[in-house]
A protein has these predicted regions:
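C-terminal accessory region of SF2 helicases/translocases
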Residues: 5-18, 25-29, 494-770
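ATP-dependent helicase/translocase motor core
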Residues: 1-70, 77-85, 667, 672, ...
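Inter-lobe coupling linker of SF2 helicases/translocases
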Residues: 114-128, 136-158, 181-322, 382, ...
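Conserved Helicase C-terminal RecA-like lobe
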Residues: 36-44, 70, 78, 82-83, ...
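Signature of the SF2 helicase/ATPase Hel1-core->accessory helical subdomain module
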Residues: 81-84, 130-201, 459, 469-484, ...
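Pre-Walker A (Motif I) flank of P-loop NTPase domains
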Residues: 60-65, 159, 384-386, 449-450
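SF2 helicase/translocase NTPase motor core
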Residues: 19-47, 53, 63, 74-148, ...
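Conserved RecA-like P-loop NTPase helicase motor core
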Residues: 141, 406-511
């Protein structure tokens, strides 16, 4: 319905206008800060330029940003384009992607330092930088690791650009961990997240997602216009549940695994984790299980020797149970050697006997394998297409290659590669498999690789879009891996319209024990709640996040209304533009938060009786669409809605001004006050002044890295110089925040809510922040 102009009413401070005039303000408020005056490099594709402008507009305000576009849309190029605005750029990337990042930067004429995740884990420092780009940033979700600590402290003074299509892997705390690399705990208080830590602890994921959206670009291919060919569309093909050995043998083997006691381990849930690890290996192949059982046997031998000699085993001993790149590396902190004593020796000897019996029961290499036979049929039927087969274990990959004689096949895993003639480098193997995507020389037919069997080493970030077929031979532990695997093929630069995705499901006896499909489905639901643009479930390669798509479509819808009558000029004086329409008592406001010269637009929507802030994107989309559909009204805006808008904004400003309230900040403040009290008793005036400055900076809020640096200083004997240096590294103190209203679209209350549109009983997480 066309929007008619309102009558000639006017209230103090309000300037009546049409809904289409307000629409442009709402569109800008939906997508957040944007560097409109910056022209991105010409080598970006049309759909990448708005992303670069949004990231460039966000970094100076929050000290960081999250680029979470779906896999295959060219996040590397967007990040490098933003890097052209900085003098010193460091990219922190997985080791497998270092060469690709360097090649891409060189091809674009850019100078960057590249540091690997693994290098940080080994204690390497980050070079001085103005911008730190963290590729596959979800690998830094564990705050207890050395790599997280190195990154947090090394990037504390720089702008941080997080690049990942999966900012949430298992739970909402994953997102908060990486955001705290550049945000203080209250860094999103003005936009509705009073405390990052408290919000995720209370599982208010809708509120967390709405607040984090102002510094996030997370789009799917479904919400973007493409000038050229779109990334291939995944086509799912289910291969069923063939077992890795005969059905009767499988049942007998499972019975023997059930008898294992995993003697010699401690830690919460250690036995369950280790049993799941063995079952997961069996789901892959007998060869993978054989290798893991040999590791368990070696561990038992060491434990028996330790018991006989009165020694204890180190934690590193238990790490040898897991292969390089094993997903269960994530849970190694929960699996540790038990205290070894003579009473344990008898139990260890019995466990060793059970392991030997299990190893002797396993069929020999080359045994009947229905799962491998089914895979061979798939590859043979597509012999002219390049195929990537993802397995959970290198031993499985090698076994499969041997089964079909290494015909034009390469195996990649654990940082190594092999073809029929012997070992080669990983880069060489990938170049042979995907010469077009990797801009390498085409090999001779004899050296060409048509089938790549790989672990998830190659599932992240690599350009392998010469391939058109992906086979999930084994299921990983998280949907993240599934989406990343498909992303090697379904990405920009592919000449294929479709990507064929084949699924092997675990045999029924194993699925009943592992619940792999259910685990993946549950984690996918969590991802969809918080800023993950698309994910996978077993049997569905691409499941789009309709909430994030709605956010992009909401901005487009508002922009279309703004263009419908050519409105959208500057407002007169400081008046607030308002459009009142006939409709339910609902309100959508484009507000602008300002502090330290920065400006952050945000969309605030109120509805219900009494009016409350609405956080769910689906409800917001429905409200705004309903308001746009109604004709203009001559009535004044409902006073209850206007008061509710003001109170909502006032409460957020109050919470912003209160500063951080997280336990880490409070603890540091107590430590600094204790140091100050001691310095006062000693009449140490030289130390009191910098301690006072430190308290001021803590009151403004600091990211995790600066908090940890201060802890180290306080652990030692702090000097005026060390405290002053810490203050010098802190970002400028945050001044008081203010709010202005760019435009308000409101229903006058003359039309009641339709059945199903009652917003009084929204999702429990949809409430105003008080």
């Amino acid at each position: 319905m066309a929007v008619r102009e309102p009558g000639a009413w006017k209230l103090d401070g309000l300037e009546p206008c049409s809904a289409s005039t307000i629409a442009l303000c709402l569109a800008e408020a939906t997508i957040g800060p944007t560097a409109h005056t910056w022209t991105p490099p010409a080598w970006l594709l049309p759909h990448q330029r708005p992303a670069a402008q949004r990231i460039a507009g966000t970094l100076p305000i929050f000290g960081g940003a999250l680029l979470a576009d779906a896999v295959g849309l060219g996040k590397t190029y967007v990040a490098l384009a933003v890097g052209t605005r900085y003098a010193r750029v460091v990219a922190v990337v997985p080791a497998a992607l270092r060469a690709q990042w360097r090649r891409t930067a060189e091809r674009l004429g850019l100078q960057i330092d590249v540091v690997s995740h693994e290098g940080l884990s080994r204690g390497r420092d980050i070079p001085g930088a103005d911008l730190v780009i963290v590729d596959e940033a979800h690998h830094f979700r564990n705050r207890g690791t050395q790599r997280y600590d190195r990154l947090a402290r090394g990037a504390a003074s720089a702008h941080v650009l997080l690049v990942t299509a999966t900012p949430v892997v298992n739970r909402g705390a994953d997102l908060v961990a990486i955001l705290r690399l550049f945000l203080p705990d209250h860094g999103l208080a003005a936009v509705g997240v009073r405390s990052l830590e408290q919000t995720v602890a209370s599982r208010d994921y809708i509120i967390l997602a709405e607040g984090a959206a102002v510094l996030t670009v997370a789009r799917t291919s479904g919400s973007l216009p493409f000038a050229g060919q779109r990334p291939p569309r995944p086509v799912d093909l289910d291969l069923g549940r063939p077992p890795p050995l005969g059905a009767r043998q499988l049942v007998s083997l499972l019975a023997r695994i059930d008898r294992l006691r995993f003697t010699g381990f401690s830690g919460p849930g250690a036995v369950s984790l280790l049993r799941a690890h063995l079952l997961h290996r069996l789901a892959s192949s007998v060869e993978a299980l054989r290798l893991t059982l040999r590791r368990h046997l070696a561990y038992a031998d060491r434990a028996v020797t330790a018991a006989q000699s009165g020694m204890q085993l180190s934690r590193s001993t238990s790490r040898r149970l897991f292969g390089a790149g094993d997903d269960l590396q994530l849970v190694i902190p929960f699996v540790a050697p038990a205290a070894i004593d003579h009473d344990l020796e008898t139990a260890l000897v019995a466990e060793r006997a059970r392991l030997l019996d299990l190893l002797q029961f396993l069929p020999k290499r080359g045994h009947r394998n229905p799962k491998a036979v089914r895979l061979a049929q798939v590859i043979h039927s597509r012999s002219q297409l390049r195929v990537i087969v993802f397995t959970a274990a290198v031993s499985t990959a090698i076994d499969l290659a041997f089964r079909w004689g290494w015909r034009r096949t390469a195996v990649v895993g654990a940082g190594r590669a092999r073809i029929a003639s012997g070992p080669i480098s990983v880069d060489d193997a990938l170049d042979r498999f995907a010469p077009n995507a990797r801009h390498s020389r085409h090999p001779s037919r004899a050296g060409d690789v048509m089938t790549l069997i790989a672990t998830d080493l190659v599932s992240e970030g690599l350009d392998l879009q010469d391939a058109v077929v992906v086979v999930h031979y084994d299921l990983p532990w998280t949907p993240v891996r599934l989406a990343q695997r498909v992303g090697r093929v379904a990405r920009l630069g592919s000449t294929h319209r479709n990507a064929h995705v084949f699924w092997f499901r675990p045999p029924a006896p194993l699925e009943q024990r592992l619940h792999m499909e259910r685990r993946i489905a549950m984690k996918a639901v969590t991802q969809m709640e918080i800023l993950v643009p698309e994910t996978s479930r077993v049997g569905t390669a691409r499941k789009l996040n309709t909430l994030l798509e709605l956010r992009e479509h909401l901005s487009l819808m508002c922009a279309e209304h703004a263009r419908s009558d050519g409105s959208g000029g500057p407002r007169s004086d400081d008046a607030v533009r308002i459009a009142v329409v006939c409709g339910p008592p609902m309100l959508a406001a484009a507000v602008r938060w300002t502090w330290n010269g920065h400006s952050v637009p945000q969309l605030v929507v109120l509805a219900g009786r009494p009016p409350r802030a609405v956080h769910d994107v689906r409800s917001i989309f429905r409200i705004i669409r309903r308001l746009f559909a109604n004709s203009a009204s001559r009535r004044a805006p409902p006073a209850t809605l206007m008061r509710a808008l003001w109170h909502t904004c006032r409460d957020r400003l109050t919470e912003w001004g209160q500063g951080p309230t997280d336990s880490a900040t409070r603890r540091l403040q107590r430590r600094v006050l204790a140091r100050g009290l001691a310095a006062s008793r000693q009449h140490n005036l030289q130390l009191l002044t910098p301690l006072d400055d430190v308290l001021d900076h803590l009151g403004s809020g600091q990211p995790t890295g600066m908090e940890r640096e201060l802890d180290r200083i306080l652990d030692a004997k702090p000097s005026p110089g060390s405290l002053a240096a810490w203050c010098g590294r802190c970002r400028p103190r945050v001044g008081p925040a203010d709010v202005q209203f760019d435009g308000i679209l409101v229903g006058d209350g003359t039309i009641g809510e339709l059945p199903g549109e009652a917003f009084e009983n929204l999702h429990s997480a949809q409430h105003s922040i008080h």
